[in-house]
Amino acid sequence: MKASKQEKWLDESGENLGILRRLEGNAMLLAMESGGFSKEDLWFLQDEQGEEYVVFPQKIFVQLLSHIKNIQEEKLVMRLEKDIISQMPIDFDDAMVVAKNALESLRLNDGNLPDINTNTLAKDIKKKYPNLFFDIDYLRKSK
C-alpha cells in the first residue's frame, strides 16, 4: 500500500525549517530557513533558546488521533482474540463474532471503547455461550 504524502510527514522533517525570534511582548517573528508556508505540511521551528517545536495543521492532528484510536482498537481485538483462544472455542470464528458484538455493545456514546479486561470478557462470553466452547471438565469425566 502506497503511503500518502501526509503519512510520510515524519520522513520529511527537513523541508519546512524555521526560526522563532521574540520581538516584543508576545509578538514573535517566524523566519523560514528552508521550505515555506504550507497548509498540508509540518513546520519544524526552533526558538532563540534552542527549544524545538513542531507545528502542523489541525487536519493532520485529527488524522493522527484517528490512527492512534484505530491502532488501540486493533490491539484490543487482538488481545480479545488471544483470550478467546485460551477459552478453547469449538469454532474460533463463531466465538469471535459473539465477542466482537459484545465489544461493540460496550462502546461509549462518543464512539470510543472503554478500558476493557479482555480476559474477563472472554470468560463471560464462555459462560453466556457455553455451546461455542469445549467443556474440558465434561471431556475429562467422560474418559
From Swiss-Prot:
The organism named in the record is Helicobacter hepaticus (strain ATCC 51449 / 3B1)
Homology family: Belongs to the UPF0763 family.
Q: What's the protein name?
A: UPF0763 protein HH_0976
Q: Which Pfam families match?
A: DUF2603 (PF10788)
- Top-level division of the source organism's lineage: Bacteria
Q: Which HAMAP family match?
A: UPF0763
